[in-house]
C-alpha cells in the first residue's frame, strides 16, 4: 500500500444526503471537515481546508499530532491525484454546517489510547484559542446571536 499523502493525495470520507449535500472529512486530519452543497464543491475546497488545519496545528506546536498508527488507516493505493475518495456513504438526514451525520467503516474501529491523547491535546489547544478570542470581544459582542440562532456567543461558549 502507498501512503496517499506521500503522493500528494488527501484521502477523504464523504457523507452525502438525499439533496446531494456533502460532509467531507480528511481522513489523516481528524476533525478537518468541509460542508458543501455538492461533492464537486467539497472536493475543490478540501486542499485549502487541509492547509488551514495544518497551519492551525503548527501554530500550536502540534504539527505531528496525528502521526500515530491509528490514523494511518487512511492508507491505500492511490488511483487519483489531489483528493482521493476513501469512502462514500449515504446520510439519512439533511447535512448542514456543523451537523455531522455520516458514519463510516472507519468509525467502527476501536479508538486507541494514542487517538484519545491526541484528541485531548487538540481540544486543549482549541480551548486556549477560543478563550483568547473571547477575551478580545467587547461585552456587547458576547450578546450577539450568530446566524440568528437561539443562543448568544456567551451561552455557546459556556
Predicted regions and their residues:
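Aromatic-glycine hotspot motif
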Residues: 2-158
Amino acid at each position: 500500500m502507498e501512503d496517499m499523502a506521500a503522493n500528494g493525495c488527501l484521502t477523504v470520507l464523504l457523507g452525502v444526503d438525499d439533496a446531494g449535500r456533502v460532509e467531507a472529512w480528511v481522513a489523516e486530519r481528524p476533525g478537518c471537515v468541509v460542508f458543501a452543497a455538492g461533492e464537486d464543491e467539497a472536493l475543490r475546497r478540501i486542499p485549502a481546508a487541509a492547509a488551514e488545519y495544518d497551519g492551525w496545528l503548527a501554530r500550536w506546536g502540534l504539527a505531528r499530532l496525528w502521526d500515530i498508527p491509528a490514523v494511518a488507516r487512511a492508507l491505500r493505493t492511490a488511483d487519483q491525484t489531489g483528493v482521493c475518495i476513501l469512502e462514500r456513504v449515504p446520510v439519512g438526514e439533511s447535512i448542514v454546517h456543523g451537523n455531522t451525520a455520516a458514519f463510516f467503516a472507519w468509525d467502527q474501529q476501536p479508538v486507541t489510547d494514542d487517538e484519545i491523547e491526541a484528541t485531548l491535546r487538540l481540544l486543549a489547544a482549541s480551548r486556549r484559542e477560543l478563550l483568547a478570542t473571547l477575551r478580545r470581544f467587547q461585552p456587547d459582542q458576547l450578546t450577539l446571536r450568530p446566524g440568528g440562532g437561539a443562543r448568544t456567543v456567551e451561552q455557546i461558549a459556556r
